[in-house]
UniProtKB/Swiss-Prot annotation:
Ubiquitously expressed. One of its GO terms (cellular component) is epsilon DNA polymerase complex. Accessory component of the DNA polymerase epsilon complex. Participates in DNA repair and in chromosomal DNA replication. Forms a complex with CHRAC1 and binds naked DNA, which is then incorporated into chromatin, aided by the nucleosome-remodeling activity of ISWI/SNF2H and ACF1. Does not enhance nucleosome sliding activity of the ACF-5 ISWI chromatin remodeling complex. This is DNA polymerase epsilon subunit 3. GO terms for biological process: chromatin remodeling; DNA-templated DNA replication; nucleosome assembly; regulation of DNA replication. Residues 124-145 have a biased composition (Acidic residues). It comes from the Eukaryota. It is found in: Nucleus. It comes from Mus musculus (Mouse). Gene3D superfamilies: Histone, subunit A. Disulfide bonds: none annotated.
Amino acid sequence: MAERPEDLNLPNAVITRIIKEALPDGVNISKEARSAISRAASVFVLYATSCANNFAMKGKRKTLNASDVLSAMEEMEFQRFITPLKEALEAYRRDEKGKKEASEQKKKDKDKKDSEEQDKSREVEEEDEERLDEDDQNEEEEIDN
């Protein structure tokens, strides 16, 4: 847990970036206003987390999940955010699935390449052994002659 109230604040760089993205070009914001928005965002996150935790506790779980957060939004009367949040969640899940599939494909490709290299290495070793055997036979034939 946080030892001081300031520890609960969101990073200023993140808040500043979000504010700049939300405002039209050329609009500035005072340090005091940025600080107020930062505190408000921190309070919102804490409140949403507390509400979501209540849903997790009702489900006898210690881990918050997406449905807990969505239920908390509804309980907090932020229904208008539920649809965009669901869309963002689906996009996130698609991205993660794509990353996982890409990672698995990369691993398969690497395994296939490694296997091909091992096969090639075995072929070279077998060819070397055949040459050595031929050389041995030739030496034996020369000795016999």
